Amino acid sequence: VSCEDCPDHCSTQKARAKCDNDKCVCEPK
């Protein structure tokens, strides 16, 4: 998942979007 799509991707998991080296990382809220 790209950084652009990260917020939507993570919100479905009720997680916080974070970017690491241009990769999407979801952190539990």
From Swiss-Prot:
Signal recorded as keyword: no
Family affiliation: Belongs to the short scorpion toxin superfamily. Potassium channel inhibitor family. Alpha-KTx 08 subfamily.
Main location as per UniProt: secreted
Subcellular location: Secreted
Primary role: Inhibits voltage-gated potassium channels.
Keyword Lyase tagged: no
Official protein name in the record: Potassium channel toxin alpha-KTx 8.4
Tissue: Expressed by the venom gland.
Family matches, as InterPro entries: Scorpion_toxin-like_sf, Toxin_alpha-KTx_8/9
Entry keywords, A to Z: Disulfide bond, Ion channel impairing toxin, Potassium channel impairing toxin, Secreted, Toxin
GO MF annotation terms: ion channel inhibitor activity; potassium channel regulator activity; toxin activity
Annotated domain remarks: Has the structural arrangement of an alpha-helix connected to a beta-sheet by disulfide bonds (CSalpha/beta).
Disulfide bonds: C3-C19, C6-C24, C10-C26
SUPFAM superfamilies: Scorpion toxin-like
Gene Ontology cellular-component terms listed: extracellular region
